């Protein structure tokens, strides 16, 4: 990893730590947070009052998003939700912004797409679910293009986009991890994009450290469970995580909350060395060349960015499955069958 990449990763870690407490750093930024909150409130009000019109794309929309900055487990939640909706008789499609990709117009994502042209999360969703996936910074345009290409799709899941109010939605699901709302301040003084009091249909909390849920209405536990690791060069070759226990292991993650990935591996009985990479790390070169380890465990989100040129036999990919509460699935299905987009 380059010096700039290492500096960025350390900066992300430092800011995230500061956002967990009401430090002098956070208080100094509260005037900017107030300005940010005012702008966000005006934008919400414009759509709530009808001054700006949300666009109904013709089918129900479920938005899976967050009110905080950083990774909370949205992507595995979207994958699990698509599978659950399909099991309930729906034909789901997925739209996403395509963060990190050079996308300006609606673009279809297939399992054969490149991460640079699709975005790492949309590509992972396409590969894991087989559902139609379209990306565009304008999610309305992405949804309309998806429907035109796949008229059988009867529900759209939006990967993120909670603040993309122009896209009318039927259900809003907000995902938190163990950090919840951090220090409770809005950006840039804290991690919140919107107040914790923001309306949503349900809240999911992914907390590997505690089984307790916050006292919020319609709140459900979100369990993320690692599966057997698969070899990057030979995907059919799989090993239970327990088999790595007596090896020199490096865990690396270029995701929004790398420590959560490391905690998952520790909970599985491993004691790896760890390396936090910047979120959406591009892997322009191999940052592991000088690491004297037997195995390197990475996330699925990082794996989709590594092409055939990566010939490091030490690389293993750890898949993660999200277990959704059956009551949450029932709530979503009921709302989809009983309400139109608004």
UniProtKB/Swiss-Prot annotation:
GO terms for biological process: lipid A biosynthetic process; lipopolysaccharide core region biosynthetic process. It comes from Burkholderia multivorans (strain ATCC 17616 / 249). This is Tetraacyldisaccharide 4'-kinase. Its EC number is 2.7.1.130. Belongs to the LpxK family. The gene is lpxK. Pfam families: LpxK. GO terms for cellular component: plasma membrane. Transfers the gamma-phosphate of ATP to the 4'-position of a tetraacyldisaccharide 1-phosphate intermediate (termed DS-1-P) to form tetraacyldisaccharide 1,4'-bis-phosphate (lipid IVA). Keywords: ATP-binding, Kinase, Lipid A biosynthesis, Lipid biosynthesis, Lipid metabolism, Nucleotide-binding, Transferase.
């Amino acid at each position: 990893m380059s010096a700039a990449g290492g500096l960025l990763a350390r900066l992300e870690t430092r800011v995230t730590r500061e956002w967990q407490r009401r430090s002098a750093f956070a208080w100094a930024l509260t005037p900017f947070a107030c300005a940010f909150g005012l702008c966000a409130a005006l934008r919400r009000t414009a759509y709530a009052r009808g001054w700006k019109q949300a666009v109904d794309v013709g089918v129900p929309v479920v938005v899976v998003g967050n009110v905080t900055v950083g990774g909370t487990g949205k992507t595995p939640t979207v994958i699990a939700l698509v599978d659950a909706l399909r099991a309930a008789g729906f034909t789901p499609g997925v739209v996403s912004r395509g963060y990190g990709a050079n996308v300006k117009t609606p673009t279809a994502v297939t399992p054969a797409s490149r991460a640079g042209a699709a975005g790492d999360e949309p590509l992972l969703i396409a590969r894991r679910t087989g559902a139609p996936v379209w990306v565009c910074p304008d999610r309305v345009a992405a949804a309309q293009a998806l429907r035109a290409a796949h008229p059988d799709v009867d529900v759209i899941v939006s990967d993120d986009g909670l603040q993309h109010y122009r896209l009318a939605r039927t259900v809003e699901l907000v995902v938190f991890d163990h950090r919840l709302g951090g220090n409770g301040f809005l950006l840039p003084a804290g991690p919140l994009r919107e107040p914790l009091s923001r309306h949503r249909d349900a809240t999911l909390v992914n907390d590997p450290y505690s089984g307790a849920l916050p006292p919020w209405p319609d709140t459900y536990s979100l369990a993320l469970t690692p599966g057997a690791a698969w070899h990057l060069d030979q995907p059919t070759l799989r090993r239970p995580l327990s088999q790595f226990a007596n090896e020199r292991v490096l865990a690396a993650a270029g995701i929004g909350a790398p420590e959560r990935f490391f905690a998952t591996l520790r909970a599985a009985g491993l004691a790896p060395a760890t390396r936090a990479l910047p979120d959406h790390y591009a892997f322009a070169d191999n940052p592991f060349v000088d690491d004297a380890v037997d195995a390197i465990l990475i996330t699925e989100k990082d794996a989709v960015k590594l092409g055939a040129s990566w010939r490091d036999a030490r690389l293993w990919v750890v898949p993660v499955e999200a277990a959704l509460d059956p009551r949450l699935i029932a709530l979503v299905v009921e709302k989809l069958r009983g309400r139109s987009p608004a």
